[in-house]
Amino acid sequence: MFDSTLNPLWQRYILAVQEEVKPALGCTEPISLALAAAVAAAELEGPVERVEAWVSPNLMKNGLGVTVPGTGMVGLPIAAALGALGGNANAGLEVLKDATAQAIADAKALLAAGKVSVKIQEPCNEILFSRAKVWNGEKWACVTIVGGHTNIVHIETHNSVVFTQQACVAEGEQESPLTVLSRTTLAEILKFVNEVPFAAIRFILDSAKLNCALSQEGLSGKWGLHIGATLEKQCERGLLAKDLSSSIVIRTSAASDARMGGATLPAMSNSGSGNQGITATMSVVVVAEHFGADDERLARALMLSHLSAIYIHNQLPRLSALCAATTAAMGAAAGMAWLVDGRYETISMAISSMIGDVSGMICDGASNSCAMKVSTSASAAWKAVLMALDDTAVTGNEGIVAHDVEQSIANLCALASHSMQQTDRQIIEIMASKAR
C-alpha cells in the first residue's frame, strides 16, 4: 500500500485519507440506503418483491431532494428499490455503478406498485442510520448501517443472524486511522505534506481525475441548476470576467451540478460526501493548472486540502446542520495557499478568514442547490487566500475566530456539534412538513 519505512504518523495520515477519500456514485445518503438494500437482496432467497426501509432524520433530510443516478427521480424510495434490484453489494459507495436499464425500469415498477416504503426510524439516537428489509413472500433479509455510509453493523435473514459487528469487535482491536487526527495539528499536517515521498501520496491524483471528469460533464449544462455552465455563459457574454477567480467557481460548481443532478459518473468523495470531495479537489486543481504545477506539486496540494478537510470534519458530527462544503473549502483554502505561497502563516490566516466568513451556512438537505453552496464556499476560499497573501485575515478579536487557528476550528466545530443541533431539528421539521 505504501512504504512501511515511513514515519508512523505519516502512515496514519495516509490511511486516514485512503479511508475517507473514495469514489462514490450518487449522493452518499441515498447511496447508503441503496447499499443496505443491495446487501440485503444478496442475502435473500429468491427475487425481491417488496422493500421496507428506515432511516435517521438526518439521512432522510439528505435524501428527500437529490436525484439518484440514472433514474431521473429524486428521493430515498427509488434509491432503496434500485439498490435492491440492481445494486452491486460489493461496490460500497459505487453500489449503483452496474445498474442496468432493466433494473431501473423494474425499480420504478416496484415503486409504482406501492411495494417500497421508507420511514424515519423512531426512536433513533444515531445521526447516520439506514436499515433495509427486502421480502420474497414470507422470506426476508435485513441489513443495518450505522455511523458511516458503508458501516454495516448487522445482517439478518428470516432464519438466522448472518453478521453482527459486536461479535467482531475482539478481532478488530486496531484503532481507526481517523483517531490520530484528534492528536495532531495543521502544522504537523503541513510538515507531512512538504516532506512525504511523492510515491506515497501519488494516489491522491485520482481525485483530480474523477472530479475533473465530473466537472466537464457539468459544463454541458444538462445537470441540476447548471450553475457552472450558466456562469461560463456569462463570461462569454461579457457579464463576468473570465479569470482565475471565476474559473475556480465555474469548474467547482459544475462538478457539483453533475453530481447532484444525477450524472452517472463517480465523484471522489471526502468524509463520506461527494460535494466535500469536489470542493476539496477542484479549486486546488484550477489554481495548480494556472501556475503550471507538475503532478508532484498538485499531489501535495491535494493531500493538504483533503487531509485538512478530514481533520476539520473529524471534529464534527458525520451529518449536521452545518454545510460541510464550507469545511471542505477550508481544506481547499489550505491547498491553494500552499500552491501560491507555501507558508504555514498564510494557510492558517486563510482558514481563519473562512471561519469568519461562511461558518454560518446551514445544511438543509442534499439537493441541486448544494452546488450553490459549493460555489459560494469555493469563492470564499480563494478570497481568503488572496487576503492572506496580503497579510490580512479575520482576527481573534472578531466573532468566533480565535488568535490561534486550531482554537478557531474548535470553536466552529463546537457550534455545529452542540448549539446547531436545535437548528438541525428545526430544518428537519420544516422539510418534513413540506413532504406531507
Swiss-Prot record:
A Gene Ontology biological process term: L-cysteine catabolic process to pyruvate
One term of GO molecular function: L-cysteine desulfhydrase activity
Signal peptide: none
Pfam families on file: SDH_alpha (PF03313)
Top-level division of the source organism's lineage: Bacteria
Family: Belongs to the UPF0597 family.
Name of this chain's protein: UPF0597 protein YhaM
Lineage, highest ranks first: Bacteria, Pseudomonadati, Pseudomonadota, Gammaproteobacteria, Enterobacterales
